[in-house]
C-alpha cells in the first residue's frame, strides 16, 4: 500500500501565507491559500493511494476535505521536521511507501506524484526540490527519522542538508523536477494562471 501525506495549515485569516500577506493583505492571502488547498485536494483525489491529511492546529470535521477520501489527523511536534517525522512514522505502519507534500505548490502534477511513488520501488528516498532551496515533496520506503533532525527549516540549507544525511546513510535517492512554492507575491504572479 502507498500513502500520500498532506500537510495543511488551518485556513484562518492572518495565519496563512504571512509572507504573501505582507504585500497583498491578509484577506487576499487567505483567498489564495484556499485556492491552493482546492488544487491540492483535487490532485490528491486523482491518485490511487491512501491519503492522510494533517492539520496544523485542529482537525476540522465538516470542512470540504471529505472523510471518505482523507484520513484526518493533527500535526504533532515542536518543528516542521518533528511533525513530518511523526507523520511518516504513522503512515509507514500500514504502508510500504509514503510521500509527503504541503499545499503551496501549484506546479505539482499527478504525473510527478506517480513518478515519486514509482521511484520508491528501487530507491529508498525521493525528493522534489523547491527553487528556494527546500523541497516540495519527500518520500521514503522505510521509516528514517534522521533525515528530519538538526535542519534549519524554511532556509536554503534544507535540501543540501537532507541530501547530505541520505548520502551519509548510504541510501539511494531520486530527485524530481525542481518546482516553486508560493511564498510571496512574485511566486503568486508566476502560478496564478494555474489556479484560475
Task: Name what the model sees in each region.
Residues 1-19:
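N-terminal nucleotide-binding beta1-loop-alpha1 segment
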Residues 31-49:
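A short, N-terminal amphipathic alpha-helix
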Residues 46-71:
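Acidic donor-binding segment of Leloir-type glycosyltransferases
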Residues 65-97, 155-158, 186:
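Short phosphate-binding loop-to-helix
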Residues 99-101:
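Short aromatic-hydrophobic micro-motifs that form the base-stacking/packing surface
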Residues 106-135:
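Conserved donor-nucleotide/metal-binding helix-loop-beta segment in metal-dependent transferases, i.e.
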Residues 144-165:
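Short, glycine-/small-residue-rich phosphate/pyrophosphate-handling segment
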Residues 164-196:
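Conserved alpha/beta core of the MobA/IspD/sugar-nucleotide pyrophosphorylase nucleotidyltransferase superfamily
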Amino acid at each position: 500500500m502507498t500513502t500520500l501525506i498532506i500537510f495543511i495549515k488551518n485556513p484562518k485569516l492572518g495565519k496563512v501565507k504571512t509572507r504573501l500577506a505582507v504585500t497583498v493583505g491578509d484577506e487576499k492571502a487567505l483567498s489564495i491559500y484556499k485556492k491552493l488547498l482546492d488544487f491540492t485536494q483535487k490532485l490528491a483525489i486523482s491518485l490511487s493511494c491512501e491519503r492522510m491529511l494533517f492539520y496544523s492546529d485542529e482537525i476540522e470535521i465538516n470542512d470540504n476535505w471529505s472523510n471518505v477520501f482523507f484520513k484526518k489527523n493533527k500535526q504533532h511536534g515542536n518543528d516542521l521536521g518533528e511533525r513530518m517525522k511523526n507523520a511518516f512514522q504513522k503512515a509507514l505502519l500500514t504502508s510500504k511507501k509514503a510521500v509527503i507534500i504541503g499545499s503551496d505548490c501549484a506546479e505539482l502534477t499527478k504525473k510527478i506524484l506517480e513518478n515519486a511513488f514509482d521511484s520508491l520501488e528501487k530507491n529508498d528516498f525521493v525528493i522534489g526540490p523547491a527553487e528556494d532551496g527546500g523541497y516540495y515533496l519527500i518520500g521514503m520506503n522505510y521509516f528514517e527519522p534522521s533525515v528530519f533532525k538538526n535542519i534549519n527549516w524554511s532556509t536554503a540549507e534544507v535540501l543540501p542538508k537532507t541530501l547530505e544525511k541520505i548520502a551519509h546513510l548510504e541510501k539511494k535517492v531520486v530527485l524530481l523536477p525542481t518546482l516553486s512554492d508560493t511564498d510571496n507575491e512574485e511566486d503568486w504572479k508566476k502560478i496564478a494562471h494555474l489556479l484560475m
